[in-house]
Amino acid sequence: MIVGPVISLLLSYFVLVSGASIEPRAAKSTDQPVDVPYDIDEFTQAASLAQQAYCTKGAHDYGLKIGDSTLLWTTGDGSLKQRVNVHHSESLGIVVAFQGTNSISPFSDFHDIQFRPVDPDARYKQYYPKGTKVMNGFQNAYTDDVDTVFKHVEKFKQEKNETRVTVTGHSLGAAMGLLGSMDIALRMNGGLHKAYLFGLPRVGNPTFANFVDKTIGDKLHWVVNGGDWVPLVPPRPFGYQHPSNYIWIYPSNSDNWRLYPGQENVHGMLTVPQDVGTSDHLGVYFHSKIGGRSGPCPSQLGGF
C-alpha cells in the first residue's frame, strides 16, 4: 500500500464516496496502553521475512538464511501477481510471507484502490458470520495465490515434521496476511500458530473484525510505526474496522513500543499527525528494516 500517498488517498476518497457505506461505524476502545507481553525477537524475525517478500533479486535462492529461517519456496513474480515466500523458522515454524505493494507495478497498485466491500471468497465464505464484508482489492490479491500456497504449506509441514504455521507481511502484504491468517485458522489442519503484520490497513467491516478477534485473538500481532497513514485507510466512516490490540512504535523507528487494547483504540496512533510520505510506513520495526523495494535485499535480521 505504498502507491504515491496523495494519489492513493485521492483515489481512495473517490472510490469510497461513489459507493455505499458497509455498515454503521463501530465503537472505539478507550483502554490505556500496556507493556508488550510477547517475545520481541519473534517480531524481529517476522519483520525481516516481511521485507524479504519484496526482494526480486535472489527471490528463488532456496536455502537462503535469514536469522533462524530458511527460504523453501516462492510463488508470484512480484508484479503481475503478488509474491509469497514460504520459509522454515526455528522460532516460528512454517512462515508464509506476503509481499506488500510493488510501487512500480500498476497491477499491484490496483489492489490498493479497489475499496468496494464484498463477501468473503467462496473458498471460505461458509466459515464467516452473515454480514461479513472485506475489501475487494485485498481479497483479489490473496485469492490469486491461495491455492498453490496452501498446497505447498501442507507439503512443507509434512517434510519438516512441523505443526506451526505463522503468517507475516507488510502493507498490502499485511492485508493479504490477515486474510491468510484467518483462512489458515479456518481451513488448514492444525490452524494458525501466530501472525505478525506490519503497517496493516483496514481489511473488513466490524463483523469481520469481531470474527478475527474471536477466531485468532492474541495469535494476531499487528504493528503501527509512528505516524504511518496506511493503517487509517480505508476510513472508518465507510464502515471499515480494525481488529483488536495493535502495537504502536513511537517515536517511529525506535525501541519504544506499547500494546493498545481493543478495537480502534483512541490513544496511540490517533493522537499524532500522520506522515503523508512513507518514512514511517517504510521504517524500522523491532530492529529489522522494512523498506519495500528500497529495503535490504536479501533482508537482514535486526541491526537497525
Curated annotation (Swiss-Prot):
Identify the enzyme class: hydrolase
Q: Which reaction does it catalyse?
A: a monoacylglycerol + H2O = glycerol + a fatty acid + H(+); a diacylglycerol + H2O = a monoacylglycerol + a fatty acid + H(+)
Glycosylated residues (UniProt) = N161
Q: Name one GO molecular function term.
A: hydrolase activity
Per the UniProt entry, the Enzyme Commission number(s) are 3.1.1.-
Q: What keywords appear on the UniProt entry? A: Cell wall, Disulfide bond, Glycoprotein, Hydrolase, Lipid degradation, Lipid metabolism, Secreted, Signal, Virulence
Q: Which BP terms from GO are recorded?
A: lipid catabolic process
One GO cellular component term, please give it: extracellular region
Report disulfide bridges, numbered on this chain.
C55-C297
Query: Does the keyword Flavoprotein belong to this entry?
Result: no
Report the protein's function. Secreted lipase involved in Dandruff and seborrheic dermatitis (D/SD) probably via lipase-mediated breakdown of sebaceous lipids and release of irritating free fatty acids. Shows activity against monoglyceride and diglyceride substrates, but not triglyceride substrates and does not exhibit regio-selective production of diacylglycerols. Hydrolyzes distearin, dilinolein, dipalmitoylglycerol and dipalmitolein. Cleaves oleic acid from 1,2 isomers of diolein on both the 1 and the 2 position of the glycerol backbone, resulting mainly in free fatty acids but no monoolein is detected.
Q: What is this protein called?
A: Secreted mono- and diacylglycerol lipase MDL3
Q: What is the lineage of its organism?
A: Eukaryota, Fungi, Dikarya, Basidiomycota, Ustilaginomycotina
Task: Name the gene behind this protein.
Answer: MDL3
